[in-house]
Each structure stands twice: as structure tokens, then as C-alpha cells.
């Protein structure tokens, strides 16, 4: 289910006055939930110098992943490990970036399917995102970007206007001219089972630190807080939750990267939005051991976050060298 990459789905309308049916968004009880943001991609550098067990994920698999799978999560043992991790966390909401879209399997030659999720794949099979979260969830992805998706547990609510288990373009967004195709910032409204609604924004900022990359990210931050392309900010509901991979570190890079500084224009204790995830130079890095680029932001929800291997009491969930990001798990409440 989808629409063209610049069209606005009527079923996901958010009024330009900044309130997505504001009267209906006041919940009958304070909202509490567990949310996860996870960039499930990889890069060739992750396995450099690592001992690779026989039959494991090594340089040959990494080359195929890069050439055919967009370096997204498509290696079945890792899918299994990640699904087990999420089952243990038992989240209400998950947002993914760089997750392989199984609908691309027909484009992949047979000899590059062996050992990956496309081996034995058939149309109608669950997507990787659906496999990770399991039964009881709806999954929806960005307009023009099926590698960026959100999943909501039906016990929390359902995506507005999405009646299926999978709505391929269920998150509305627009392309930023000159910054690639498809929506890297996208919005969906969740109709809460307890009453009211929550506006969810999934962010995957453009990567790189050349001037054009930074400029793209500035414009993407503006999509979140100024205008998504339909006259309203992405975060334009009565209550908003913004999650994802910013591809910059506002706590470390604001003096160097204008896109990091732009986040601080809108997010802080003296701003309309606040950081739920920790920021700052003393925060243990969750990306490649060097930075914190995966974040959670809200205007009404507060809470605490943790990440495997960097937060005390939370060990690794896989022994396979693949991910350069760690998942961020946040317990939130109003």
C-alpha cells in the first residue's frame, strides 16, 4: 500500500495548524511505552581484523551485502539474534533504518541469494522488519524508502489509516531536493488503544561530512521541526516522539557540523522538545565506538535509555560482527 514519493496520503493527514486532530490526541490516561530505534546496517570496516568462524559472516558475505543488499540486515543468523533481542525487550514501538527490503529479492541474482534472506524467498513472505518484530505488530515504511520502517505493537495502537499488517509507504514524507530520493524524515500518527494519538517521526539523516551532506541534514532537521513539505512540521501532533539515526552527534559536533547545531535550536530543556536519549561528550558512544548519533526526542514523554554492551547490566545480543550501530531502548512516560 503506498503512494508516489511526493504525494501526501489523505489517511495520514496532519493539519497544517500543528495539531493532528488535537482534540482526539488527548489520551484518557498518561502514556507509557517502551521504544527502540535501531539502524540495522553495517559497513565493511566492522569485520576488519575480526576472526570469522567457519560458515560465519565474513569478507565474502560483506561484499555481497554491499553489492546487493545495501548493507542492510539480510543475514538470517543476525535476523534471528535481533528478533530474539526484541522479543526479550518486548517493545511497543520500533523504528528501523537500513533494514533490507525483501521486495528487492527478485532483482538479486540467484548466486547472491545463497545464505541471505532472499534464498527461498517468495512474494508475500514476511519482510525482514516483520520477521524481527513478529506477530501482533503493524509495520509501515517511508514513502520511497522501504529500508526505513516503523513497527507498532497493536496493544499500544495502530497506524492511522493503515488496515493491513504492512503498509509499505505508510509513513508520509517528502524528498529533499539534491539529497537523494525518497523521504529520510517521515511521519505517522498512531491511534492509541487507550484513546488519543501519538505522532511518530522516524529520522535517517544523510551521511557524510562534506558541506553538501551537512546542508542536507540541516534541511532534514527543518523537516522535523519546521515543514515536512506539507505545510506542517513532521513533529506536529499534540504529543510527538522523534526517533532515529541523525547521522550527526549534537552533543559532540555542534561546533563543527551545522546540522548538529540545528538540532540544538529545537531540542533542549529550554526548548519545545527535549532529549530523552543522553547527549554530551561524556556519554558512552553507541555508534562505532566514537559517537552518539542515534537519538530519541519528545515534547511530552520523558524516560531513560540503554544500549547493549555500553550500559551496565546489558550485554551483547549477538556474537556476530555486523552492526556498527547499537540499538537504543527507551522506557518512556508522560
Name every feature range the model reports, one short phrase each.
Residues 6-19, 23-131, 198, 218-221:
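N-terminal, active-site-proximal structural segment of metallo-dependent hydrolase catalytic domains
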Residues 93-98, 136-144, 236-237, 277-279:
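Surface-exposed patches in mature extracellular/periplasmic domains of secreted proteins
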Residues 48-74, 102-130, 158-179, 211, ...:
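Surface-exposed intrinsically disordered loops and tails
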Residues 28-30, 86-88, 131-134, 143-144, ...:
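Extracellular/periplasmic catalytic domains that process cell-envelope and extracellular macromolecules
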Residues 40, 99-199, 203-205, 304-311:
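Structured beta-strand-rich core segments of catalytic domains in phosphoester-bond hydrolases
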Residues 34-40, 78-113, 151, 188, ...:
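Active-site beta-strand/loop signature of hydrolases that rely on acidic residues for catalysis
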Residues 1-2:
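C-terminal motif of bacterial Sec signal peptides marking the signal peptidase cleavage site
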Residues 228-241, 248-334:
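Metal-dependent phosphoester-hydrolase catalytic domains
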